[in-house]
Amino acid sequence: METRRSFIRKSVIIGAAICLPAAVGRESLAAYPDLKTRNPKKALVLWYSQTGQTSRYARLIACILKDRGIAVDVRDMQEFDKNGLASYDLIIVGTPTFYYDTPDNVRDWLQTIPLIPGTPVAAFVSFGGPEGNQHNAATHIIKLLLEKGGVPVGRDAFRNIASYPTPKWNTANQISGQHLPNAATFDQVRRFAADVLERITRGQAIAVGYEMALREGLRVLPLIWLNKKLISKHTVDAAKCIDCQTCVKKCPTKAINPSRQTVDRDKCLACFGCLNNCPADAVVMEYRGERLYGFPEYLRRNKIVILEPPEFKACNM
């Protein structure tokens, strides 16, 4: 049976004709405003996370900054008051890569933030497999922050176990990434945080440009709409639902209503946050008639325990 990913990949042929011109943009360093500080005292690490992967990296970054003597707030983007952004000397934004891009809800949120002139900014993305256009997804975040006056000082992408649900959870990416994140991943995160601080101290920004990537062309296609067409059922099992409201909290568009067992298909972003976080396996989703199950159940069935960085033993972020 064709998987969602194989269906989407067939669209590469269409996107390839569009992607090449999209990958050449690069900002001139001279176009950036001056950094408002070379000695940040207060930093904000914002994250959007569905299965805990991105928030894990965000917390590790926050621990590293805290260890350097910086006052750090690490917050869920969906719960943060954007009017407070101007009070920070450094802003780092982290998000998963969805459909080869920055998630729509993250993009919409960043487009409405107030100006942050001269504030050092950095971005990172988490991803579950190679060829996910992760460099460009992180670049899209940087571009949005640039539009608000931010000065880019860092960008990176960190791989972890894939959490994009498939009927059998046995795609090549899911199998090859079952051991991630590992110690090397956390070392990469540490280097990212250290490099960000070093660039700020030097007053050095990074050049922001896109990579040549076939997946970049797919951004112009209605991938979410196409994927939802292949999801034949999306509801809530009233007999299993424990009314914990986890699905509502995790849904970025509040499309799900567990008390009514309904999902607003027009508002749904097909992010699988409801399925991947329901503790009672009450979210029912079928792909072309085949039942999906969520990330926690996948970990349980395969006896997978995700590694935590050692910093978390002493750092409470």
Describe each PLM feature range.
Residues 236, 242-269, 273-291:
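Iron-sulfur cluster-binding cysteine motifs and their immediate structural context
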Residues 214-242, 249:
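A mid-sequence, solvent-exposed acidic-amphipathic segment
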Residues 1-18:
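N-terminal secretory signal peptides and thylakoid transit peptides that target proteins
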